């Protein structure tokens, strides 16, 4: 992992930035710029990074600039908050038959085959082989329409996409073929993209993706420096292209980390919700952390409750050189508490030295005496998105004395709920079997990015193959949930994942340029003198693109499906069995994906009878989860408005004697579940019925 230090810049920042400006920075961002720290960042004062910036009007956007410029922006009265996130982690032959998707591709029992034709499938990832046969059509032409390499500074004949101003964009087949691959360190992106949209033209379609005729757009991240704001930009880039060519679009995010509130209110999740809508869907991976011990949740009923105490442990050897070593604590709005760090003797079973880290103003450096070498940097913030307290602990510990541990203690001073997440790369949480200490549970191991957004479709993984190259996976059972598949609920109690799909072991394309030595070969094919490889991978990273490919076939049938309607179709058509039972739940969501049933349900919704489209009279509609707003564009008399379910049941009706152009009428939707609805509006002989999703 590349490391660039910014100690030269930190002195400037601390001396020039006022206290009020520091309060605009997220806790992680404060620590990145703290005076005198050896901040482990992939950026220096002149190198650029991508941040989330929230303005005083509440609008959040992304900005690509240097840390020095961000420091200047913090002094700007129009800026409400600046946040730089941590880096993301990367998270079919049997699978297509098992889910009924082979029948979708063949058109069996359907009006026609559904292969994703006319739909854009976007992948934000790393490890792409642009020239793989899996991304070619029947006549050998690439189906990849665009590539944005965010971390590449220059490439002959290519420039940065105009709307974003960094990286390079490849817009022609010649340039994409010349580009070959974004990196030589992994095959993750190739495998993921081919599961979603790999071609059926080779090897008799045995390893084709779920949407083999879809148009493909790839965004290649630089995993050494990318932030979640870069992922947001990647999603927007893909949606912008789909808008330009007039096609529906689904974007896959087989990425995640545990930097955030896990409640759908992060800057990333809020922007993802805003970008989605009719014909604009995001599918994400739940995460591969079910067995890992890194999350604790505690609801305190009163100040008299016993404190929460847990050990912060090291999954890897302690080091002061890794930016990802963190623990985050989130406390619900208005909760009062005291938080401390201490060095604990496992031999004497007592704290040797302790320091209060909350309440604090801004940042604090904690040293644990002679028991640990290095420091823990702490920053606090009342997060403006959810009004929760966010406490960020950045470990810079290089050694710990034998038989000692680091303890985090939360003493309640009021009732309230606390969630604690370790980064699960370098740090974990544990009780060490010491009486009075709390061990993590397996609940709420769902990851940020793909697992927590309110409109994102989140996929867990189940097992469709346990053998590979004469070997057998010892911890997996056919049909069972993957032992790794992260579970919900989210911190605000929502069911995640919504659906599960095949994710273990999946055969798909792998990159010919991958020199990491980690590929598990399954098959190969020679075309035009070049050998193309296919290999095994497992994880929710494989389940998510399977779902994304299924969604692409649904969008082919109904291009204006909203995220809410997609979720409704997937959940109501999902399968249950002896493994996936007592649904919905936080492991399986609503069950196993049934691609054929989902496509059939989609076709039913597009074939609702008595829907007329021959009238020019129709107000503009604005739909949100709680309200349907009608804005009338012309004067009309004797107007009737009727809201019906997709099955035709009348749910609400309104009669208006006269309406004037520019007037509006609202219909409450909060009491109705998510799904597809019909709205019929009539005025005299003018009648029109439209479908919309809530």
Spans of features found by a protein language model:
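Bacterial Sec-dependent N-terminal signal peptides
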Residues: 1-28, 587, 667
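C-terminal tail/sorting-segment detector
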Residues: 21, 674-694
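Loop-rich non-cytosolic ectodomains and luminal regions
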Residues: 21-603
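Structural beta-strand segments of beta-rich domains
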Residues: 323-325, 626-630
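Residue-level detector of functionally pivotal "anchor" positions at catalytic/ligand-binding pockets or at interdomain
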Residues: 600-627
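Glycine-centered tight-turn motifs at strand-turn-strand junctions
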Residues: 650-671, 685-686
């Amino acid at each position: 992992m590349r490391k660039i230090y910014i100690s030269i810049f930190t002195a400037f920042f601390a001396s020039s930035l006022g206290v009020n400006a520091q309060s605009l920075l997220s806790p992680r961002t404060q620590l990145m710029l703290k005076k005198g720290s050896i901040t482990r960042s992939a950026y220096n004062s002149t190198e650029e990074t991508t941040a989330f910036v929230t303005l005083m009007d509440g609008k959040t956007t992304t900005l690509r600039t240097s840390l020095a410029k961000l420091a200047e922006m913090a002094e700007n009265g129009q800026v409400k908050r600046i946040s730089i996130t941590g880096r993301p982690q990367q998270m079919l032959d049997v699978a297509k038959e098992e889910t009924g998707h082979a029948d979708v591709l063949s058109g069996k029992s359907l009006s026609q085959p559904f292969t994703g034709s006319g739909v854009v499938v976007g992948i934000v990832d790393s490890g792409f082989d642009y020239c793989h046969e899996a991304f070619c059509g029947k006549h050998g032409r690439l189906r990849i329409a665009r590539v944005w390499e965010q971390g590449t500074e220059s490439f002959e004949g290519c420039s940065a996409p105009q709307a974003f101003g960094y990286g390079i964009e490849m817009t022609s087949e010649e340039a994409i073929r010349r580009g070959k691959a974004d990196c030589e360190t992994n095959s993750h992106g190739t495998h993921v993209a081919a599961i979603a949209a790999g071609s059926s033209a080779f090897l008799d379609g045995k390893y084709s993706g779920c949407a083999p005729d879809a148009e493909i757009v790839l965004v290649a991240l630089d995993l050494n420096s990318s932030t979640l704001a870069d992922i947001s930009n990647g999603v927007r880039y893909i949606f912008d292209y789909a808008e330009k060519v007039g096609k529906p679009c689904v974007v896959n995010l087989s990425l995640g980390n545990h930097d955030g509130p896990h409640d759908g209110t992060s800057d990333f999740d809020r922007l993802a919700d805003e970008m989605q809508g009719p014909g604009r869907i995001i599918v994400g991976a739940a995460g591969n952390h079910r067995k890992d011990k890194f999350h604790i949740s505690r609801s305190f009923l009163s100040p008299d409750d016993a404190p929460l105490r847990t050990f912060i442990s090291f999954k890897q050897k302690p080091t002061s050189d890794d930016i990802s070593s963190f623990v985050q604590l989130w406390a619900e709005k208005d909760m009062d508490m005291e938080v401390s760090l201490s060095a604990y003797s496992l031999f004497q079973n007592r704290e040797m030295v302790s320091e209060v880290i909350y309440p604090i103003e801004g940042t604090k450096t904690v040293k644990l005496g002679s028991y640990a070498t290095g420091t823990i940097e702490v920053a606090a913030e009342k997060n403006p998105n959810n009004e929760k307290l966010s406490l960020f602990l950045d470990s810079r510990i290089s050694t710990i004395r034998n038989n000692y541990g680091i303890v985090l203690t939360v003493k309640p001073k009021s009732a309230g709920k606390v969630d604690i997440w370790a980064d699960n790369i370098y740090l974990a949480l544990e009780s060490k079997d010491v009486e009075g200490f709390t061990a993590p549970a397996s609940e709420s191991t769902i990851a940020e990015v793909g697992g927590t957004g309110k409109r994102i479709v989140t996929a867990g993984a189940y097992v469709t193959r346990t053998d590979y190259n004469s070997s057998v996976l010892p911890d997996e059972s056919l049909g069972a949930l993957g032992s790794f598949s992260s579970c919900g609920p989210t911190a605000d109690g929502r069911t995640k994942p919504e659906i599960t799909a095949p994710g273990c072991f999946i055969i798909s394309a792998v990159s010919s340029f991958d020199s990491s030595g980690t590929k598990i070969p399954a098959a190969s094919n020679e075309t035009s003198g070049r050998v193309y490889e296919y290999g095994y991978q497992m994880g929710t990273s494989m389940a998510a693109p399977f779902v994304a490919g299924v969604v692409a076939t649904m969008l082919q049938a109904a291009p204006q499906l909203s995220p809410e309607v997609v979720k409704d179709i997937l959940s109501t058509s999902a399968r249950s069995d002896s493994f996936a039972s007592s649904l919905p739940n936080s492991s399986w969501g609503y069950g196993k994906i049934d691609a054929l049933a989902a496509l059939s349900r989609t076709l039913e919704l597009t074939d609702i009878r008595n829907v007329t489209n021959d009238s020019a009279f129709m107000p503009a509609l604005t739909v949100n989860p709680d309200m349907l707003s009608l804005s009338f564009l012309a004067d009309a008399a004797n107007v009737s408005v009727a809201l019906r379910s997709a099955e035709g049941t009348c749910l609400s009706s309104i009669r208006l004697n006269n309406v004037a152009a520019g007037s509006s009428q609202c219909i409450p939707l909060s009491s109705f579940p998510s799904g597809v609805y019909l709205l019929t509006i009539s005025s005299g002989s003018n009648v029109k019925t439209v479908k919309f999703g809530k």
